[in-house]
Curated annotation (Swiss-Prot):
It comes from Synechocystis sp. (strain ATCC 27184 / PCC 6803 / Kazusa). One of its GO terms (biological process) is protoporphyrinogen IX biosynthetic process. The gene is hemL. PANTHER family: GLUTAMATE-1-SEMIALDEHYDE 2,1-AMINOMUTASE (PTHR43713), GLUTAMATE-1-SEMIALDEHYDE 2,1-AMINOMUTASE 1, CHLOROPLASTIC-RELATED (PTHR43713:SF3). It catalyses: (S)-4-amino-5-oxopentanoate = 5-aminolevulinate. This is Glutamate-1-semialdehyde 2,1-aminomutase. GO terms for cellular component: cytoplasm.
């Protein structure tokens, strides 16, 4: 066990109780409230490497990684050092900074689809902007998204969405005008025939298809062989754009993202998480002729006070430099596969039906026999059993995402010893379920 002392969360309970009078649900993002797993949310105090400490002094091995950005580990000394130097020059300029050029060149060099890039402040903002760009470039209004894929909380995307919407069991969200979502068409993930049928019904009105190339917001779901290739062919056939939401997969499943890993080049890509090194960031980019539509070069307006923030750019640059070191992704592949194989074996030995998988530093397990190919399959998972598993792991010093419907994220800071320790704890917890 990571925690050698009794699991006490008195301070977390006090802080969370006060927070509920100050913020809706006591949190700044819904999944943090532990609604789907029950129990007391943990209030963090500090992070380092693969470990986190809460305000009560409990220590955990972390597999959330701030929901993806901490691929090099928390508070990496090189990132912290670079940020301290940048901080001495100021926190925000609201004007061009040299760091934007450096990070932009790194992104363009790495991601096959990106010839030009625009920095924003979050993945949601990137997806909102790329939605407008899709429609501006094509002159069409409708889009296709996939059930369970999450692209932020913009109105047009809150249709059969994943992430917190899946966690809370919400079909959509109040406050979204019905007219807004009429132009959003949905299909099951991994179902090319359903996508083709939508194009046949709407041959001249679909601006594009947007998806997570590897789903991480309905749990972890890989694309079937030929699925991404089929989408590329269909979008070309009907004159629509293909958009990969790589906010989660970008620079995580490979240095060039899922598109480099699978060899499929979309027209546009959204990024976030890793490229900010733990600071708020987002980006969207693609072919130069499409990006030329974006103001001030073109007529499609999009702006942001803190976009291209020098601190976020600095953290992103240093993070990508670390990831460029030889062997980084081979190591991430190795430890993540070791983790998932160990978890699945532990579950099977204890008599539980669990399935799962991984790709580089991204993984997931479902409390279901599987296979899980889409959102409907994911919803068959035993969320009550997952909640008990989550609590058992938490009390023994392992911090997993507090939802069955979220992927997990190991980092370069995780050691094989920590992976093996996690598997040993899981064996203990599975035996109690």
């Amino acid at each position: 066990m990571v925690n050698a002392t009794p699991f006490i969360t008195t301070k977390s309970e006090e802080i969370f109780a006060a927070a509920q009078h100050l913020m809706p649900g006591g949190v700044s993002s819904p999944v943090r409230a532990f609604k789907s797993v029950g129990g007391q949310p943990i209030v963090f105090d500090r992070v380092e490497g693969a470990q986190i400490w809460d305000v009560d002094g409990n220590q955990y091995i972390d597999y959330v990684g701030t929901w993806g950005p901490a691929i090099c580990g928390h508070a990496h000394p090189d990132v912290i050092s670079a940020l301290k130097q940048a901080l001495d020059k100021g926190t925000s300029f609201g004007a061009p900074c040299a760091q934007e050029n450096v990070l932009a060149e790194m992104v363009i060099d790495a991601v096959p689809s990106i010839e030009m890039v625009r920095f924003v402040n979050s993945g949601t903002e990137a997806c909102m902007s790329v939605l407008r760009l899709m429609r501006a470039f094509t002159g069409r209004e409708k889009i296709i998204k996939f059930e369970g894929c999450y692209h932020g909380h913009a109105d047009m995307f809150l249709v059969k969405a994943g992430s917190g919407v899946a966690t809370l069991g919400l079909p959509d969200s109040p406050g979204v005008p019905s007219n807004t979502t009429k132009a959003t068409l949905t299909a099951p993930y991994n179902d090319l025939e359903a996508v083709k049928a939508l194009f046949v019904e709407n041959p001249d009105s679909i601006a594009g298809v947007i998806l997570e190339p590897v789903v991480g917001n309905a749990g972890f779901i890989l694309p079937d062989a030929g699925f991404l290739e089929g989408l590329r062919e269909l979008t070309k056939e009907y004159g629509a754009l293909l958009v990969f939401d790589e906010v989660m997969t970008g620079f995580r499943v490979s240095y060039g993202g899922a598109q480099a890993r699978f060899g499929i080049t979309p027209d546009l890509t959204t990024l976030g998480k890793v490229i900010g090194g733990g600071l708020p960031v987002g980006a969207y980019g693609g072919r130069e002729e499409i990006m030329a539509m974006v103001a001030p070069a073109g007529p499609m307006y999009q702006a942001g006070t803190l976009s291209g923030n020098p601190l976020a750019m600095t953290a992103g640059i240093k993070t990508l430099e670390i990831l460029q070191k030889p062997g980084s992704y081979e190591y991430l592949d190795k430890i993540t596969k070791r983790l998932v194989d160990g978890l699945l074996a532990a579950a099977q030995d204890a008599g539980h039906e669990v399935c799962g998988g991984s790709i580089s530093a991204m993984f997931g397990i479902f409390f279901a026999p599987g296979p899980v190919r889409n959102y409907e399959d994911a919803k068959l998972a035993d969320t009550n059993k997952f909640a008990r598993f989550h609590r058992g792991m938490l009390e023994r010093g392992i911090y997993l995402a507090p939802s069955q419907y979220e992927a997990g994220f190991p980092s370069l800071a995780h050691t094989q010893e920590q992976i093996d320790q996690t598997i040993a704890v899981a064996k203990e917890v599975f035996a109690t379920l």
